[in-house]
Amino acid sequence: THGSRIVWEALIDEPLKGLKLLFGDHEKHDPSIYKYAWKIWFFGDSQSYFVIRVAALFDIFTFSSYSATAILFAAFSFSGSWALFLTFYKIAPDFHKWIAFSCLFIPSVFFWGSGIFKDTITLAALGWLTYSFYTVSFERRNMVTNGIIGLFAAWIIFSIKKYILLSFLPALIVWFFLAR
């Protein structure tokens, strides 16, 4: 993306400033990074800038190639969709075809989970949050690892679209108490 390329260029030209752009608190106006920050259209929007940061992390490995970065976004999104599929498959294996269709093959899920969007990241995080919640709450295995994955996924969703987390948490709570 445009913004992630600027962060990537900063990492190449001036690594400390690039790291500030990547990991620093962008809401504190640091004059040392102004040279790069003013070029990033969404620098002032923390939710959009989070996506730029993720894309910039991927850009490190893809040398800022848009196509390769988009493939990494799609792979991350698919991993979350697959985790969601596995979760529901464990619950109802007899309905595996319907579960696969609903988690993996619905066109809108396929579309929104395949580009460099906020939705791509939140879809993946939602899948991983569901998977880790089920594994910790019902299977009671790998609780530390899955707890960390769940907290990380919740943090990602909270950083990008708080309302998704606020509407999903009550569903998890109801699921937890009804399944017991």
Regions found by a protein language model. Name each.
Residues T1-A37:
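Extracytoplasmic loop-helix module adjacent to an early transmembrane segment
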Residues D30-L72:
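Juxtamembrane segments of multi-pass membrane glycosylation machinery
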Residues T69-I91:
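Transmembrane-helix motifs of polytopic, lipid-linked glycan transferases
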Residues Y89-D94, L129-T145:
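Membrane-interface transmembrane helices that cradle and orient dolichyl/undecaprenyl
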Residues I99-L104:
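Short helix- or helix-capping micro-motifs
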Residues F110-F111, T145-L165:
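Membrane-interface alpha helices of multi-pass inner-membrane proteins
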Residues G115-T120:
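Short acidic/glycine- and proline-prone juxtamembrane loop motifs at membrane-interface regions
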Residues T130-F138, L166-R180:
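Perimembrane helix-loop-helix junctions
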